[in-house]
Regions:
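Nucleotidyltransferase catalytic core that binds NTPs
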Residues: 1-141
Length: 141
């Protein structure tokens, strides 16, 4: 499994993989549900790319981004054992450089369900997913 940290590296590595490419975005702290998604991608795609990125945009002001569990070495080992070909694990600065201000507005759903209790949560999720999908260029997710 190749591990990359920059958008340029991820773009280059993903383009080189056999198609179709399946993308499994995560924030790490992997559980069996994540691994089931990897297994599904492995069964239906020629290549699998996973991401580990704890996205600060989906945490509200009273939520503790800093305390979100991070176990990169163990998560990477589990993803490799599950058959992931490429792991993209960028820094916050890589995903949201100084001056970044483009976000995805999820519309009304952003204020319903979990969004009613966590303002901005769905905007953060939609933004990071759009960025990860664009970087990966995957056919399936």
């Amino acid at each position: 499994m190749e591990i990359v940290r920059t958008i340029a590296e991820a773009d280059c590595a993903a383009r080189a993989l056999p198609r179709p490419l399946g993308l499994v975005p995560t924030m790490g702290a992997l559980h069996d549900g994540h691994l089931a998604l990897v297994a599904r991608a492995r069964a239906t795609c020629a290549s699998v790319m996973a991401t580990i990125f704890v996205n600060p945009l989906q945490f509200g002001p009273n939520e503790d981004f800093a305390k979100y569990p991070r176990a990169f070495p163990e998560d990477a080992r589990r993803l490799e054992a599950a058959g992931v070909d490429l792991l993209f694990a960028p820094s916050v600065a890589e995903m949201y450089p100084t001056g970044f201000d483009t976000t995805v507005d999820p519309g009304a759903v952003g204020t319903r369900y979990e969004g009613a209790l966590r303002p901005g949560h769905f905007r953060g999720v939609a933004t990071v997913c759009a960025k990860l999908f664009a970087i990966a260029g995957a056919e399936r997710a």
